[in-house]
């Protein structure tokens, strides 16, 4: 196992004269008359560690195995580097080849590969410079999320992956069953493993509300699933969601937390992953640093849905999707508001109840609910949330109204019970982890920020 002080990122910061061991995978080998220069990386740093291997240290048949992709370990001394880009390099005393990579067949040779090509190499793309940077940012973002909530006293809650309820009421769910669905007989789900219809979860929100009614401030961070046949750069069938739920919290408190949360995530990643962000800015998005600084330093604009529709209708723009009160905003509308009207993130609140979920608290006007969407330049919606309906009678009526859309009152008996026994105003939101990663990395396709993308027709690896 590589020890913390032996990672490449640590070795690059150490002083000349130290005796060290480095392990990792060969990026390149360059040969001179009496010396070999090896670029070594173990995934911990966007910068490779140079290994200087004098002729004769190992037999030539071993040198021949030191090709791109090979796994090696090196013992030697750190010396001041004469090359550009690093302060130190290893003067090798011994080298071991643990695993070879035949250059005739290893697909990640020293050249720029398209993202499409790398998606086909999900078992190897993690070794590329691009995905090394992306997945280090992914790791940092996960750490930032836990730190933000733990520093504020939130409890981390594990919610079920298999559920009998639809938190979104949208019906786009993966069914879980042990029954033989090819049987000519109609499926009897009372005889199924769980004795009822069950699905992969679309959200942990409803279960998180249970914990919010006992521990006040909680959050979930786990996988969610949507059986939407959307083959776009913004959609996945399996992705991760962060969902805080807070008791004694209204819509304004929810907006305040969401803004602080986003700024905190960006600040953490900028501080933790500077070289990775510089690499991604160089190759994929020259405006990345400017974009991230803009979010950190902006005061988010807050407008109602009605005000947003008015701005869109008065814009004089010919949108692909016409705007009218009662219709959901599309990506083009979100980007217009954030990039052209306000030039910063925007929180839109108080949406028509007919386009939002059943659990959102009804406003006094009877037409809108206390919902919010946080929109960011370049990507659109990045957070969706609401104050939850805490009034038992109002929630029950709303569930009954939604029966035509597949909501079954009996499936939500426990959710209604929360309002009967010590209910309180509460709120929460959800953030798509991969959507945030797209924003942080400048990647344009969501398949490039998750290790193993699950999309229609694709479940490889």
Swiss-Prot record:
- InterPro entries attached here? Aa-tRNA-synt_II (IPR004364), aa-tRNA-synth_II (IPR006195), aa-tRNA-synth_II/BPL/LPL (IPR045864), Asn-tRNA-ligase (IPR004522), Asp/Asn-tRNA-synth_IIb (IPR002312), NA-bd_OB-fold (IPR012340), NA-bd_OB_tRNA (IPR004365)
Record-listed E.C. numbers: 6.1.1.22
Q: Does the keyword Protein biosynthesis apply?
A: yes
Identify the enzyme class: ligase
Its primary localisation, in coarse terms, equals cytoplasm
Which GO terms are recorded in the biological process aspect for this UniProt protein?
asparaginyl-tRNA aminoacylation
The record's listing under SUPFAM superfamilies reads: Class II aaRS and biotin synthetases (SSF55681), Nucleic acid-binding proteins (SSF50249)
Q: Which CDD domains match?
A: AsxRS_core, EcAsnRS_like_N
Does this UniProt record's set of keywords contain Nucleus?
A: no
Q: Which cysteines are joined by disulfide bonds?
A: none
- A single Pfam family it belongs to is tRNA_anti-codon
Reactions listed under catalytic activity: tRNA(Asn) + L-asparagine + ATP = L-asparaginyl-tRNA(Asn) + AMP + diphosphate + H(+)
What family is reported? Belongs to the class-II aminoacyl-tRNA synthetase family.
**What is the protein's quaternary organization?**
Homodimer.
Q: What is the official name of this protein in its record?
A: Asparagine--tRNA ligase
Q: Whose protein is this, by species?
A: Solibacter usitatus (strain Ellin6076)
Origin organism lineage? Bacteria, Pseudomonadati, Acidobacteriota, Terriglobia, Bryobacterales
């Amino acid at each position: 196992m590589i020890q913390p002080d032996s990672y490449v990122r640590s070795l690059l910061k150490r002083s000349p004269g130290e005796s060290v061991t480095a392990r990792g995978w060969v990026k390149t080998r360059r040969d001179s008359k009496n010396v070999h220069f090896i670029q070594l990386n173990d995934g911990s740093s966007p910068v490779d560690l140079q290994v200087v291997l004098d002729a004769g240290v190992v037999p030539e048949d071993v040198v021949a195995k030191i090709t791109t992709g090979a796994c090696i370990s090196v013992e030697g001394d750190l010396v001041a580097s004469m090359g550009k880009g690093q302060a130190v390099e290893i003067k090798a005393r011994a080298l071991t080849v643990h695993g070879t990579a035949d250059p005739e067949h290893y697909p990640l040779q020293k050249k720029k590969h398209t993202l499409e090509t790398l998606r086909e190499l999900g078992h190897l793309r993690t070794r590329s410079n691009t995905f090394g940077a992306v997945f280090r940012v992914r790791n940092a973002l996960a750490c930032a999320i836990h730190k933000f909530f733990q520093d504020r006293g939130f409890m981390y809650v594990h919610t079920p992956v298999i559920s009998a309820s639809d938190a979104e009421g949208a019906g786009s769910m993966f069914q879980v069953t042990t029954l033989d669905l090819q049987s000519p007989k109609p499926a009897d789900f009372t005889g199924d493993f769980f004795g009822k219809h069950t699905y992969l979860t679309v959200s942990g929100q409803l279960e998180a509300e249970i914990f919010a009614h006992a521990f006040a401030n909680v959050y979930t961070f786990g996988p969610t699933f949507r059986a939407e046949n959307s083959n776009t750069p913004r959609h996945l069938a399996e992705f991760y969601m962060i969902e805080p739920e807070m008791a004694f919290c209204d819509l304004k408190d929810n907006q305040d937390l969401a803004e602080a949360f986003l700024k905190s995530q960006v600040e953490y990643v900028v501080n933790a992953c500077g070289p990775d962000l510089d690499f991604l800015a160089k190759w994929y998005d020259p405006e990345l640093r400017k974009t991230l600084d803009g979010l950190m330093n902006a005061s988010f604009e807050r407008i109602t849905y009605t005000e947003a529709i008015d701005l869109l209708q008065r814009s004089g723009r010919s949108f692909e999707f016409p705007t009218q009160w009662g219709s959901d905003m599309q990506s083009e509308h979100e980007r217009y508001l954030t990039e052209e009207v306000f030039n910063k993130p925007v929180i839109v609140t108080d949406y028509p109840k007919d386009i939002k979920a059943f659990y959102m608290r009804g406003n006094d006007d009877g037409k809108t609910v206390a919902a919010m969407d946080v929109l960011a330049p370049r990507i659109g919606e990045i957070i969706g949330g609401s104050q939850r309906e805490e009034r038992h009678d109002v929630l029950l009526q709303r569930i009954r109204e939604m029966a035509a859309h597949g909501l079954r009152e009996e499936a939500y008996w426990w959710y209604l019970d929360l309002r009967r026994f010590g209910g309180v105003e509460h709120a929460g939101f959800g953030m798509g982890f991969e959507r945030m990663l797209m924003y942080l990395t400048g990647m344009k396709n969501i398949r490039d920020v998750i290790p193993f993308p699950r999309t229609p027709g694709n479940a490889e690896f």
